[in-house]
UniProtKB/Swiss-Prot annotation:
Reaction(s) the record says it catalyses: uridine(1939) in 23S rRNA + S-adenosyl-L-methionine = 5-methyluridine(1939) in 23S rRNA + S-adenosyl-L-homocysteine + H(+)
A GO BP annotation: rRNA base methylation
Protein's name in the database: 23S rRNA (uracil(1939)-C(5))-methyltransferase RlmD
Organism from which the protein derives: Enterobacter sp. (strain 638)
Active site residues of this protein: C389
Its EC number(s): 2.1.1.190
PROSITE patterns named among the record's database cross-references: SAM_MT_RNA_M5U (PS51687), TRAM (PS50926), TRMA_1 (PS01230), TRMA_2 (PS01231)
TRAM domain ranges (all copies): 8-68
Protein function: Catalyzes the formation of 5-methyl-uridine at position 1939 (m5U1939) in 23S rRNA.
Entries under InterPro entries matching the protein: 23S_rRNA_MeTrfase_RlmD, MeTrfase_TrmA_AS, MeTrfase_TrmA_CS, NA-bd_OB-fold, SAM-dependent_MTases_sf, TRAM_dom, U5_MeTrfase_fam
Binding site for [4Fe-4S] cluster: C81, C87, C90, C162
CDD domains: AdoMet_MTases (cd02440)
């Protein structure tokens, strides 16, 4: 029989249960058990009990919302940022730094099946030297929204402050908002990037329509009054420097010049410790030949070259290879060779692969380094240091080395992004 009306949806009462969280996941959710499954509860910390409303019930896990928290964990702290819980930037400001680090270390140890030997961390606040803020002009209010995206949304949280930004950049926010709001072309602004180099701040403004002469003058005056380097980006691939000098930062005492488009580590303090730890773990000797894979513009390569006989850096982004070569030249390092090669392809025929090496360092992107693991084994270096931004691909790639007879000597959790779910790490493998 034909049906000419919508069938009524079956309404089920949302079940309310009482549970206790036992773990904290990377997204700041408490993890409890219910009906033999993991139950994820935003905002609940380990050892906290709560009345929870079940909001989603899948075959392997459930989700819930806290209706009433019955006790507070001693690790619960007041979030420092007024935007926490709405802004998608941070997930764990309600948890103590100690709990954040122990939760990440436990997750890393579980994946790697090895204890975490050390935690490398820095200041938990004011650490972020780079940020991209979205811009959106609201015609109804005639105001410019400037901020970060909401979690799982394209909506912008109009931020007035951001305590994880380095203080110099956070202090710029109200002045920057006023400057951009006053532009005639405020409707055509896409986003603004802020970076604090060691020689001062820089700003990249993405605009989708040509800026008027008065707007350019306002921006240039702003850059001079706040002593920052100004770049304009009329298109995603075009960058015009309007004022200021080339930005640079120090790595192991070396000056590394970079472009605003180049990748640099967001957390300078942890980056410095990470470079020093890699050098220590590799135990670089004056006669060593060292290979640095996914080398970028030389964050590890050049410090290694100060200690080794020779260093080869391999990188898939040509602009970073060119920057690495320039930085080697400017720092009078003539024992470094850079190769522009795609490390996701067959590496055995690439020119760098014909060399022999005593030590290897690799720092791949989130996808890991499955294409190079067998060749590293073939090279048979005495030590391998793997720096990772994704523990899942690190665990996968590690299996190849472990199967070839390497052993994990040291495992460190890098707290590169406090108050977020990002987990970075580094491992020393030795034959």
């Amino acid at each position: 029989m034909a049906q000419f009306y919508s069938a009524k949806r079956r309404v089920t009462t949302r079940q309310i249960i009482t549970v206790e969280a036992t773990d904290l996941d990377p997204f700041g959710q408490g993890v409890a058990r219910h009906n033999g499954k993991a139950l994820f509860i935003p905002g609940l910390l380990p050892n906290e009990r709560a009345e929870v409303t079940l909001t989603e019930d899948k075959s392997k896990y459930s989700r819930g919302q806290v209706k009433r928290r019955l006790n507070d964990s001693p690790e619960r702290v007041a979030p420092r940022c007024p935007h926490f819980g709405v802004c998608g930037g941070c997930q764990q400001q309600h948890a103590s730094v100690a709990l954040q680090q122990s939760s990440k270390s436990t997750a890393l140890a579980r994946l790697m099946k090895h204890e975490v030997n050390e935690i490398i961390s820095g200041e938990p606040w004011g650490y972020r030297r780079r940020a991209r803020l979205s811009l959106s002009y609201e015609p109804k209010t005639q105001k410019l929204a400037m901020g970060f995206r909401k979690a799982a949304s394209s909506d912008i949280v109009d931020v007035k402050q951001c305590p994880v930004l380095v203080p110099h950049l956070e202090a710029l926010l109200p002045h920057l908002r006023n400057c951009l709001s006053d532009l005639q072309g405020a409707r055509a602004l896409g986003h603004v990037e802020l970076v604090l180099a060691d020689n001062g701040p820089l700003m990249v403004l993405r605009h989708t329509a040509p800026l008027s002469a008065p707007d350019r003058e306002k921006l240039e005056r702003f850059s001079h009054s706040h002593e920052l380097t100004l770049f304009l980006a009329p298109q995603s691939e075009i960058l015009e420097r309007v004022s200021g000098d080339d930005p640079w930062y120090l790595s192991d005492g070396l000056r590394l010049t970079f472009s605003p488009r180049d990748f640099i580590q967001v957390n300078d303090g942890v980056n410095q410790q990470m470079v020093a730890k890699a050098i220590e773990w590799l135990d670089v000797q004056p006669d060593d030949r060292v290979l640095d894979l996914f080398c970028g513009m030389g964050n590890f390569t050049l410090p290694l070259a100060q200690r080794a006989a020779s260093v080869v850096g391999v990188e898939g982004v040509n602009a970073l290879v060119e920057k690495g070569q320039q930085n080697a030249h400017h720092n009078a390092l003539d024992n470094v060779t850079f190769f522009h090669e795609n490390l996701e392809e067959d590496v055995t025929q690439q020119p760098w692969a014909q060399h022999g090496f005593d030590k290897v360092l690799l720092d791949p992107a989130r996808a890991g380094a499955p294409g190079v693991m067998q060749h590293i084994i073939k090279l048979a270096p005495k030590r391998v240091v793997y720096v990772s931004c994704n523990p899942a691909t690190l665990a996968r790639d590690s299996e190849a080395l472990l199967s070839a007879g390497y052993q994990i000597q040291r495992l460190a959790m890098l707290d590169m992004f406090p108050h977020t779910g990002h987990l970075e790490s580094m491992v020393l493998f030795q034959l």
